[in-house]
From Swiss-Prot:
One of its GO terms (cellular component) is ribosome. Belongs to the universal ribosomal protein uL5 family. This is one of the proteins that bind and probably mediate the attachment of the 5S RNA into the large ribosomal subunit, where it forms part of the central protuberance. In the 70S ribosome it contacts protein S13 of the 30S subunit (bridge B1b), connecting the 2 subunits; this bridge is implicated in subunit movement. Contacts the P site tRNA; the 5S rRNA and some of its associated proteins might help stabilize positioning of ribosome-bound tRNAs. This is Large ribosomal subunit protein uL5. Pfam families: Ribosomal_L5, Ribosomal_L5_C. The lineage of its organism: Bacteria, Pseudomonadati, Pseudomonadota, Alphaproteobacteria, Hyphomicrobiales. It comes from Rhodopseudomonas palustris (strain BisB18). One of its GO terms (biological process) is translation.
Length: 185
């Protein structure tokens, strides 16, 4: 009795529709040339963690709820006296998502979290880095449904970087548009 393995909705959509569309649009000779999602990196920098270590731990716990896997706490590398920052102090958290968790996160980001942003007019189409990767900033992490709004003491921003195997920004934009990323016109 062989049960089929779980495949995220966006991965299935990529295999069925998007791959063929991109091959036709850009004229790829090989299936492996078609750009695909590589990883998603979530980063939370907590400036207030300089004075209170618990804020970095709270941010890491929230990031774990959002991402579905344990984040790495990031530490300062150098001491900066003007910020009262010493070396090796916790100042944030980051997590890298790949495979199924990556597709699930992007699905929740596009369909649930971004529509909850106040005054959302679309994503900036100029936030590509020139090598096919896209970065966006989120001002309040409470837009994710995993975070309980009533229990939140503070809200923090976070960076989301979507890394693709695309070689150019045009290929990456076509890939992310096919995944229904709401780019501004």
């Amino acid at each position: 009795m062989a049960e089929t393995a779980y495949v995220p909705r966006l991965r299935e959509q990529f295999d069925r529709e998007i791959r063929g569309k991109l091959t036709e649009q850009f004229g790829y000779a090989n299936v492996m040339q078609v750009p695909r999602l590589d990883k998603v990196v979530l980063n939370m920098g907590i400036g207030e963690a300089v004075n209170d270590r618990k804020k970095a731990e709270t941010a890491a716990a929230d990031l774990a709820l959002i991402a579905g896997q344990k984040p790495i706490v990031t530490y300062s590398r150098v001491a900066i006296a003007t910020f009262k920052l010493r070396e090796n102090q916790p100042i944030g958290a980051k997590v890298t998502l790949r495979k199924a968790k990556m597709y699930e996160f992007i699905d929740r980001l596009i369909n649930v979290a971004l529509p909850r942003v106040r005054d959302f007019r679309g994503l900036n189409p100029k936030s590509f880095d020139g090598r096919g990767n896209y970065s966006l900033g989120i001002k309040e992490h409470i837009i994710f449904p995993e975070i309980d709004f009533d229990k939140m003491g503070e809200t923090w921003g976070m960076d989301v970087t979507v890394c693709t195997t695309a070689r150019t920004d045009d290929e990456a934009r076509a890939l992310l548009t096919a995944f229904n990323f709401p780019f501004r016109q």
